[in-house]
Amino acid sequence: MGRDTIAEIITSIRNADMDRKRVVRIASTNITENIVQILLREGFIENVRKHRENNKYFLVLTLRHRRNRKRPYRNILNLKRISRPGLRIYSNYQRIPRILGGMGIVILSTSRGIMTDREARLEGIGGEILCYIW
């Protein structure tokens, strides 16, 4: 049985955010690097650096947290895996869902690479819906 690397990075980031950890280390692959670059560009994480250990590459992510002393801690990241190995979900560019009226993003795997829902709509291409982030 294969590993679902996208679900692994989503779970790692979600667990670190719930545990209020500032740094997360995930395995580096082409698809994880592309997803992390989208998260960085959209402002969901603060920093990314590539780390090598025993001939294996890892991405070290610095998460963005809201600290408010008056209220209890709130998670800033909500991630949900949509298309999975057992059930692939595809969409054309006209039917790509809008998350929270455009406040969240949808990450898609298209024929032109991994991109956000806004980029896919502008280019007029659809693809496999990987995850929602809000």
From Swiss-Prot:
Q: Where in the cell is it found?
A: Plastid, Chloroplast
Alphabetic keyword roster? Chloroplast, Plastid, Ribonucleoprotein, Ribosomal protein, RNA-binding, rRNA-binding
Tell me which NCBIfam families the record gives: PRK00136.1
Q: Which domain of life does the UniProt lineage start with?
A: Eukaryota
Q: Describe its assembly.
A: Part of the 30S ribosomal subunit.
The record lists the organism as Solanum lycopersicum
Annotated function: One of the primary rRNA binding proteins, it binds directly to 16S rRNA central domain where it helps coordinate assembly of the platform of the 30S subunit.
The protein's matches in Pfam families, at most eight in alphabetical order, are given as: Ribosomal_S8 (PF00410)
Q: Does the keyword Ribosomal protein apply?
A: yes
Q: Name one GO biological process term.
A: translation
What the record says about family reads:
Belongs to the universal ribosomal protein uS8 family.
Q: Which GO terms describe its cellular component?
A: chloroplast; ribonucleoprotein complex; ribosome
Name by which UniProt lists this protein: Small ribosomal subunit protein uS8c
